[in-house]
Design a protein with these regions (language model features):
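Hydrophobic, aromatic-rich transmembrane alpha-helices
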Residues: 215-226, 516, 523-580
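Perimembrane helix-loop-helix junctions
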Residues: 223-228, 390-391, 420-454
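Transmembrane signal-anchor helices characteristic of membrane glycosylation enzymes that use polyprenol
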Residues: 23-42, 230-264, 283, 449-467, ...
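Transmembrane-helix signature of polytopic, membrane-embedded enzymes
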Residues: 236-239, 313-314, 334-358, 376-377
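Start-transfer (signal-anchor) and selected internal transmembrane alpha helices
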Residues: 2-37, 202-250, 326, 442-453, ...
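Aromatic-lined ligand-binding clefts that engage carbohydrates, nucleic acids, or primary amines
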Residues: 82-102, 134-140, 175
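Transmembrane-helix motifs of polytopic, lipid-linked glycan transferases
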Residues: 219-224, 317-342, 381, 562-565
Length: 666
């Protein structure tokens, strides 16, 4: 029976190769990540099990970088009334190095199998145990995170295992109560400002008037949706967004000094290195020099070109031009993808423009000097080119040139764009084989030419890395000679299953969970410009409005998810092979970038690693999902008896968009 079911399933899967590819691309990476989290010693992912818990010293939560080896002693006394009559064993796991003492006698232990700390060791301690009072002490050292211990004693009448009854101390300091290893502890500094709800109450009158004005504009604007006036609104919305962005740049972004921004000092050091030495640094030369060089070379070029005009333009202001134009370019990328997806639906194209123009993470990140906006723009251009290829009746040589150029430049800006390369290759191959019915020789020649162009553009840099370091990809979690960590330094399942802190205390809510981190950095400056204290947050933004956005945006988040589900439905039910291919490609591209963020949080388990703007390369697909979701809600509210709900919906939407803009312009 089971064989027959499996045979039918396999027959259906092989009959639809597109579905097979999508399933493999979705499920395969998930299985890989789960396997790494459970088995790999390079992934500090912890499981409490068998009645024992991982414990740690009660160090206060901090946003500062820690550049030291954590050394902690853990101890517990236990009593033995009589000889247990059987061997006594200690099953021990330590993150990462340990020394074990029973009654202050050192106990020699072999390294875990394959030196994998997750497997732990099992040590017989019977020779050192005596009747009466006994003590067990473990000294744990970890240069890449907090010192953690998991231990249970087997062979006794009662279970003795690590929990909150154990004592802990650092070196010769007094013994204190150990705490459970918890990666969801809040940063106390996040509690130093009012909650989002308190900010909403503070802005109650403003909310009322903006809501009323939004309902009025909806009523007046309904007139423009008779006939074919959507095209006019598309032009008006595009012009309005451009003017709004230009105002933000001239009035706000230009005022942000060189002390504000994510890793800003290191980005500036990279540019300064090129200015002074006229050379590209090695990945090990400084904190941020592991990044590919394109953004820094372009910044160097801008400074050199405008050097005679330094009396008019401040050099630091010039460095803001590339991130700003890239951020505005990301809005264009979303529009360009929307034109392909919604070629016969101007209303949803209008929604794409509005969604893209108001995504908060794109707005605030474009104000800071860094490589992320440029990387997102170039990766977005690659997606634009790809969807145009999928819409075209034939894959041509010039398509491969442009696609290879854009994707090569994106990978030369940041390695994250590399996750799109296999996705693009797989979908190009599917397009040519199953849609265009090309022979394998033609497919191989096109794909080979695309890879050649991309390699010519960016390959030299990665060959240089191989020459110096023995590997092409240098990322901040494996740089030679750099040992550092930040809280929490490890992760548990709870971190990936929790959510809610971003709705109460959004700033630094990234300490609480993966989803709080993404939510707080998508809808606002949840990590306050890379600063470690609320008192040092960027003073150009309006945090009254920004804090209120976090609650107002909760329905919008649901609408984005609804749009993603709608996209999946379109991918499954669309009968046009090119349209099906495009929407599936957008879903998988978004999924790949999001999965890379998840992997990075496993590899680098620090509070600031889960940032929504690492998904900025997928802003085009995100905007399409948003447009699909808002379009579905609009259709639900179309019946005339829902007029009150429609007024409520558009009043809320207008208030949300206004508050988002005032967060940065107010």
């Amino acid at each position: 029976m089971v064989r027959e079911i499996l045979a039918r399933v396999l027959k259906k899967i092989t009959a639809k190769p597109g579905v097979t590819i999508a399933v493999v691309l979705l499920v395969g990476p998930l299985g890989f990540l789960f396997s790494c989290a459970y088995f790999s010693p390079d992934i500090p992912f912890l499981f409490h099990h068998s009645g024992a818990f991982w414990i740690r010293f009660p160090e206060p939560v901090s946003a500062y970088i820690r550049g030291y080896t954590d050394r902690v002693h853990f101890a517990k006394d236990f009593y033995l009334d009589q000889d247990p009559g059987s061997p006594i064993w200690v099953h021990l796991k330590a993150f990462r190095e340990f020394k074990l003492y029973i009654n202050e006698n050192p106990v020699t232990a072999e390294s875990p199998p394959g030196k994998n700390w997750k497997k732990g060791v099992k040590i017989e301690i019977s020779p050192w145990v005596k009747s009466g009072r006994n003590s067990i002490r473990t000294h744990v050292e970890n240069p890449m995170g907090p010192a953690l211990l998991w231990l249970r004693i087997e062979g006794l009448k009662d279970l003795i295992a690590t929990d909150e009854t154990w004592k802990a101390r650092i070196e010769s300091s007094p013994w204190v109560q150990a705490i459970l290893a918890d990666d969801t502890r809040a940063n106390p500094d996040s509690l130093s400002v009012p909650t989002s709800y308190q900010y909403i109450r503070k802005k109650g009158t403003t909310i009322f008037w903006i809501f009323a004005a939004s309902v009025g504009l909806w009523g007046i604007g309904g007139f423009f949706f008779h006939g074919r006036r959507e095209e006019i609104l598309i032009k008006v919305a595009s012009a309005g967004i451009i003017m709004g962005w230009v105002y933000l740049f001239l009035a706000k972004m230009i005022r942000i000094g060189p002390a504000i921004g994510f890793d800003i000092s290191h980005h500036l050091d990279y540019i300064l290195f090129i200015l002074e030495k006229r050379a590209i640094p090695l990945a090990s030369d400084d904190w941020a020099t592991f990044h590919p060089p394109l953004f820094y070379l372009l910044s160097f070029g801008v400074l050199e070109i405008f050097k005679p005009f330094y009396s008019i333009f401040r050099p630091f202001h010039l460095l803001k031009v590339i991130p700003f134009l890239s951020g505005l370019g990301n809005v264009w990328v979303a529009y360009a993808i929307g034109r392909v997806v919604f070629k016969d639906d101007p209303f949803r194209l209008l929604l794409v423009i509005i969604v893209a123009g108001f995504i908060p993470m794109n707005i605030y990140l474009s104000a800071y000097v860094g490589n992320e906006p440029l990387h997102a723009f170039l990766a977005g251009c690659s997606l634009v080119m790809a969807v145009h290829i999928f819409r075209s009746p034939e894959v041509k040589v010039f398509h491969m040139i442009y696609l290879g150029l854009f994707l090569g430049l994106a990978v030369l800006t940041k390695i994250t764009a590399g996750v799109l390369v296999p996705v693009v290759v797989i979908f190009l191959a599917y397009k040519m084989i199953h849609v265009d019915r090309k022979d394998l020789k033609g497919v191989a020649s096109r794909l080979g030419f695309f890879i050649l162009i991309m390699t010519v553009v960016c390959g030299w840099y990665y060959i240089r890395n191989i020459t110096h370091f023995g590997r092409p990809f240098m990322i901040n979690w494996n740089l030679p000679g750099q040992l550092w960590w930040q809280d929490p330094g490890f992760h548990t399942l709870q971190y990936y299953l929790s959510f809610g802190e971003a709705l109460r205390h959004p700033y630094f809510s990234a300490f609480h969970s993966f989803w709080d981190a993404l939510y707080s950095t998508f809808w606002g400056e949840g990590l306050i410009g890379g600063k470690a204290l609320m008192a040092k947050r960027p003073d150009v933004w309006n945090y009254d409005y920004m804090s209120a956005v976090y609650l107002f945006a909760l329905p919008a988040t649901g609408i984005f998810l609804l749009g993603l589900l709608k996209a999946v439905q379109m991918a499954l039910k669309n009968t046009d092979p090119n349209s099906k291919l495009i929407i599936t490609f957008l879903i998988i591209s978004f999924y790949s970038v999001a999965l890379f963020i998840w992997l990075s949080t496993l590899k680098v388990p620090i509070y600031g690693q889960a940032k929504a703007f690492y998904c900025l390369a997928a802003m085009g697909p995100i905007s399409v999902f948003g447009a699909l979701g808002f379009g579905v809600v609009r259709e639900w509210l179309m019946p005339s008896h829902y007029i009150a709900l429609r007024a409520l919906f558009y009043g809320w939407l207008g208030t949300l968009l206004t508050f988002i803009y005032l967060s940065y312009a107010g």
